[in-house]
């Protein structure tokens, strides 16, 4: 039986509608490690440097917004390209081969840890807006129990006023982030967020849940094979809960207004320590950390733009020393901070690479400045 034109038109419209529905279906991506544990706070980008978002505390991003191929990156794992093919899927990430050799404990009065940090402000409309790198010499006196630090840095920005403003308003804060912490993270979290009844629950298999009176805010995962302890937590959520618990209504409303403006916000905080066979670690066992805020915001044209503010810190040298050895180590670790030297340093010390799309934008920024 032949179809009339009207019937053909109806069927064609139905097919088009079905295809539109299928193409609009969310492609849910989950990131896991080789043991099947979720990897939270993985950055997800398109191959042309546009941010899609960040996986949540359970390693999930609900929709990659129709991207055919995505670039995924996390400070503790190797970056990876993944073909979505219009389907939901699971991505297994490989550990980055970053890490200092085991430190030999010696009867020396001082502990020396050099940390390297990098900061970037990224906007998928303009690229990398600000970039800053620095070195901090951390010296811990084992007798007096005091920590002394000194930091050197260099920075580049798309606009000179941004470089000046950031240095004035946040430079000291960033430098402080690069200092090793004398208290374990668990104690720091409990101390800072005591108002929200933070507790740490052992779930077995080397995994602990960090929660407050409103639910989960993070996880602690011990990887005995790698000899590492990994902390992933959402400081933004914990801070908002603390304002609520303290009854600070004005600050809470201000925070809620900011969250409404900064859509799909993720505060992706991460710390990594080396642990011994008994699961113990000391301040000098610090390996790396990340503080990252990611969100969508409308520009002046009313278009949605993704923004990322990120601070990453890496331990690059450590030793038990006396005063003369300390002086020599500091001298050896001095470096002229040109972009080429920075890239060579990162490669030599196996610093995890930035997402290829961000690295490309960073290269453009540095050339523009030079």
Q: Model-flagged regions — what are they?
A:
Residues 71-83:
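A short, solvent-exposed loop/turn motif at the edges and junctions
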Residues 27-36, 59, 91, 103:
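A short, amphipathic beta-strand motif
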Residues 1-29:
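Bacterial Sec-dependent N-terminal signal peptides
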Residues 34-48:
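Short, ordered, surface-exposed loop/turn motifs in non-cytosolic proteins
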């Amino acid at each position: 039986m032949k179809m009339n034109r009207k019937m053909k038109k109806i069927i064609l419209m139905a097919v088009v509608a079905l295809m539109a529905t299928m193409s609009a279906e969310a492609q849910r991506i989950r990131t896991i490690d080789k043991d099947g544990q979720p990897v939270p706070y993985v950055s997800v980008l398109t191959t042309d440097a546009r941010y899609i978002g960040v996986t949540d505390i359970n390693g999930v991003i609900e929709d990659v917004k129709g991207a055919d191929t995505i670039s995924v990156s996390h400070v503790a794992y190797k970056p990876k390209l993944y073909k979505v093919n219009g389907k939901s899927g699971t991505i297994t990430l490989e550990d980055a081969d970053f890490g200092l050799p085991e430190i030999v404990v010696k009867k020396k009065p001082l502990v020396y840890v050099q940390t390297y940090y990098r900061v970037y402000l990224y906007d998928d409309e303009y690229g990398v807006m600000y970039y800053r790198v620095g070195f901090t010499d951390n010296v811990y006196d084992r007798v007096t129990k005091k920590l002394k630090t000194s930091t050197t840095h260099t920075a580049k920005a798309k606009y000179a006023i941004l470089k000046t403003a950031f240095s004035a308003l946040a430079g000291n804060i960033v430098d402080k982030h690069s200092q090793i912490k004398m208290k374990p993270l668990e104690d720091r979290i409990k101390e800072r967020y005591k108002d929200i009844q933070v507790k740490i629950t052992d779930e077995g298999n080397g995994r602990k849940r960090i929660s407050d009176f409103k639910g989960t805010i993070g996880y602690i995962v011990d990887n005995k094979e790698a000899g590492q302890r990994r902390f992933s937590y959402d400081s933004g959520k914990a801070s908002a809960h603390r304002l609520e618990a303290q009854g600070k209504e004005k600050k809470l409303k201000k925070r809620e207004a900011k969250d409404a403006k900064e859509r799909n916000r993720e505060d992706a905080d991460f710390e990594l320590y080396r642990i011994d066979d008994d699961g113990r670690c000391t301040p000098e066992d610090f390996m790396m950390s990340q503080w990252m805020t990611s969100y969508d915001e409308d520009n002046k044209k009313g278009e949605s733009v993704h923004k990322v503010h990120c601070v990453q810190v890496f331990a690059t040298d450590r030793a038990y020393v006396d005063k003369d050895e300390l002086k020599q180590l500091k001298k050896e670790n001095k470096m002229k901070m040109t972009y080429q030297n920075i890239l060579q340093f990162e490669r030599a010390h196996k610093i995890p690479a930035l997402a290829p799309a961000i690295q490309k934008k960073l290269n453009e920024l540095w050339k523009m400045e030079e």
